[in-house]
Amino acid sequence: MEAKAKELGGGDTPPPTGKVFENTNNVNIPDAGTAVTSSVTVSGISGNAPATLQVGVDIKHTWRGDLVIDLVAPDGSTYRMKSSSSNDSADNVITTYTVNASTEVANGTWKLKVQDVARYDTGYIDSWKLTF
């Protein structure tokens, strides 16, 4: 499912320096299964994506080392943000990755691609966002 852009800011906190595109629809990640994706459609950004594209992810999972996480650009180019690690038994991936996407046109459908590569633990994409 696609999400719409929303501007963040207000109060005493300065607004972010860029425009935020977010998807808050949950996507279940099958245990030791095929990769799943969650999409956001970016529009209204001139030119290419930045060299410091911020990718915020909130993934609930009972063994985060099982997960491989990629950002997929509108042209299909894939940027690996997290590889699997059998030693990482902690829960959840709640972080922001910085991706050099400066060769990519900003506008279009971007995807977060997540795959669980080991058995016994499950989870879901809770939300994710791109900040331009």
Q: Model features per residue range: what roles?
A:
Residues 9-132:
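Loop and turn regions of beta-sandwich accessory domains that flank beta-strands and are enriched
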Residues 1-9:
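Hydrolase catalytic cores
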